[in-house]
């Protein structure tokens, strides 16, 4: 995910230390993350309390926790999100914990989670390059990696694991980004064993990514240019970055401030805040916008889901 407001502020006045408490990870997440600025609160719909990884491992090798969406609020709260695909107002947020990755001035920017329920969380400070941490989805413990930011021009990026073939347990971490948020962007892969980036192709716009167990890569392209580019979702060719199957989101028009994106049950959930307001969750099918949810006081800067998530609607 990206958080445009914080970036614009840094360019205008310069960024010092922020009083941000970073949210812990729970369950397994796909794409998302994002920059949180100061202030804001959690709250919103759904239950509170703390949660763990939860559930045993099924025949697909996935825990129950690996099948939920996870979100990060600008105040650092990490929560699970169980969508109700029949009535979105019955969807439940459950707050899990706080991240404490000792990333200096950098803030959560994007995240993905592998099928082993390990979260890969990117931090970015708008000045240097990204840092990458591995986060336990059971207790939010952070472990720094040796990832070197800035490879192939990817100073910042959104990311999402994608199954290598439909139903496969093998997966690849795709990334999309570039030098600055909202600027020219490229599609690439990040090898989680060597922590090296390989460029795949160019992207139109600067999307947040989500992957699926169907071996598909999708992007949410927010409106970053005062309505000159309509907010939309597109399927992205994993070999070139080309878009297809574009789904327009007219009601999501307007300058985006914070956005995140996740696939679940054959459908999509866009977490979008305009200016510094609360996040609205847009429930989207391939036919277009289905319904939406007001999250109350949540200002979500990241969301994601693993390739273990269901690929057909489950209610």
Model-derived regions: residue spans:
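Conserved beta-propeller blade signature
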Residues: 68-71, 79, 118-122, 166-176, ...
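Ser/Thr-rich, Pro/Gly/Ala-heavy low-complexity intrinsically disordered linkers and tails
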Residues: 10-64
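Short loop/turn segments immediately following the C-termini of beta-strands
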Residues: 73-74, 83, 124-126, 164, ...
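Repeated scaffold domains used in trafficking and secretory/extracellular systems
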Residues: 60, 101-114, 150-164, 202-214, ...
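An edge-strand/N-cap motif at the start of beta-rich repeat modules
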Residues: 58-87
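Structural motif
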Residues: 75-82, 127-135, 181-189, 226-235, ...
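Short loop/turn segments that connect beta-strands within beta-propeller blades
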Residues: 83-86, 135-140, 191-195, 237-241, ...
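Beta-propeller fold detector
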Residues: 88-101, 142-150, 196-205, 242-251, ...
């Amino acid at each position: 995910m990206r958080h445009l407001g914080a970036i614009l502020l840094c360019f205008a006045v310069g960024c010092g230390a922020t009083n941000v408490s970073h949210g812990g990870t729970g369950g397994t997440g796909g794409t998302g993350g994002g920059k949180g600025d100061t202030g804001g609160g959690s709250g919103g719909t759904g239950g509170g309390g703390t949660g763990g990884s939860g559930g045993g491992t099924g025949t697909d090798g996935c825990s129950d926790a690996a099948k939920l969406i996870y979100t990060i609020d600008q105040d650092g709260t990490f929560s699970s999100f169980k969508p109700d695909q029949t009535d979105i107002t019955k969807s439940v947020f459950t707050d899990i914990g706080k991240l404490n990755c000792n990333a200096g001035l950098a803030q959560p920017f994007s995240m993905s989670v592998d099928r082993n329920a390990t979260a890969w969380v990117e931090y970015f400070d708008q000045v240097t390059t990204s840092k990458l941490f591995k986060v336990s989805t059971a207790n939010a413990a952070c472990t720094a990696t040796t990832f070197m930011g800035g490879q192939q021009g990817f100073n910042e990026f959104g990311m999402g694991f994608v199954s290598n073939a439909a139903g496969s347990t093998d997966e690849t971490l795709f990334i999309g980004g570039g030098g600055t948020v909202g600027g020219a962007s490229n599609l690439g892969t990040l090898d989680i064993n060597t922590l090296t980036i390989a460029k795949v192709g160019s992207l139109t716009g600067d999307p947040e990514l989500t992957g699926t167990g169907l071996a598909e890569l999708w992007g949410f392209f927010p409106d970053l240019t005062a309505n000159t580019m309509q907010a939309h979702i597109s399927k992205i060719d994993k070999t070139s970055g080309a878009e297809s199957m574009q789904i327009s989101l007219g009601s999501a028009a307007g300058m985006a401030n914070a956005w995140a994106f996740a696939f679940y049950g054959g459908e999509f959930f866009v977490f979008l805040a305009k200016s510094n307001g609360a996040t609205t969750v847009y429930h989207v099918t391939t036919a277009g916008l289905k319904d939406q949810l007001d999250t109350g006081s949540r200002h979500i800067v990241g969301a994601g889901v693993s390739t273990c998530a269901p690929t057909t609607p489950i209610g």
